[in-house]
From Swiss-Prot:
GO terms for biological process: anterior commissure morphogenesis; cerebral cortex radially oriented cell migration; cerebral cortex tangential migration; corticospinal tract morphogenesis; DNA damage response; neuron migration; proteasome-mediated ubiquitin-dependent protein catabolic process; protein K48-linked ubiquitination. Component of E3 ubiquitin ligase complex consisting of FBXO45, MYCBP2 and SKP1. Functions in substrate recognition but also plays an important role in assembly of the complex. Required for normal neuromuscular synaptogenesis, axon pathfinding and neuronal migration. Regulates neuron migration during brain development through interaction with N-cadherin/CDH2 after secretion via a non-classical mechanism. Plays a role in the regulation of neurotransmission at mature neurons. May control synaptic activity by controlling UNC13A via ubiquitin dependent pathway. Induction: Down-regulated in response to DNA-damage. Induced upon influenza infection. This is F-box/SPRY domain-containing protein 1. Pathway: Protein modification; protein ubiquitination. The modification N-acetylalanine is found at A2. The gene is FBXO45. GO terms for cellular component: cell projection; cytoplasm; cytosol; extracellular region; glutamatergic synapse; intracellular membrane-bounded organelle; nucleoplasm; plasma membrane. The lineage of its organism: Eukaryota, Metazoa, Chordata, Craniata, Vertebrata. It comes from Homo sapiens (Human). SMART domains: FBOX, SPRY.
Amino acid sequence: MAAPAPGAGAASGGAGCSGGGAGAGAGSGSGAAGAGGRLPSRVLELVFSYLELSELRSCALVCKHWYRCLHGDENSEVWRSLCARSLAEEALRTDILCNLPSYKAKIRAFQHAFSTNDCSRNVYIKKNGFTLHRNPIAQSTDGARTKIGFSEGRHAWEVWWEGPLGTVAVIGIATKRAPMQCQGYVALLGSDDQSWGWNLVDNNLLHNGEVNGSFPQCNNAPKYQIGERIRVILDMEDKTLAFERGYEFLGVAFRGLPKVCLYPAVSAVYGNTEVTLVYLGKPLDG
């Protein structure tokens, strides 16, 4: 079983492909950085609480004292203040981020959420920053990728539908080249060699336009229930994609993934349905 672990480094920012997702390393300086390095941690924390993520990332590289001050407590005032400034009130007030253990983890999840610039024209990302809404457009399948993809490391995220599935509702991964919109109602994820998907409606695994069997591999597998959180586990070391449901490990769905940048992705067909995706970080085996 996999569970999220707090990030060891700074929350990732920007868009594109991430490596192992470990974040910034400890400052290269051998000691304190002048007078600033000798400031008490509580004073540094107060100063850091006014900075933005990119500035905090630079501060973490100054010296080991600053790095420890930033990353010693993931619920410190630094991360709480940044969380309050960066995330929508709805995301913090509701249970969207209930499985994230710290303010820092919540910021990291936001950095890895759906991209507003890398989705079908028929969907939009709601103000909470984590939920996709599909407009009621006839004869169209619409998808979205996250802001950051992965070429290294192990990563976990949760996905759940908050509306009807329709005839096709697919979760999985995609390269940057995979299309995020097409005509008709089809399994967009898995329709070519650039994406891999699990259709929650009929439990089929899809890749390269073909059905790769049913999933999970058991008799009378239960159907997906609206609101049920599915955990997706991408292992770029073993080149596998696996799924969990309710902390039950369902098995490895895809093996032999290519060594390219892969993005969490979904595709939907039902009008006004909504899909939420939350990045959890590195999974722990248990």
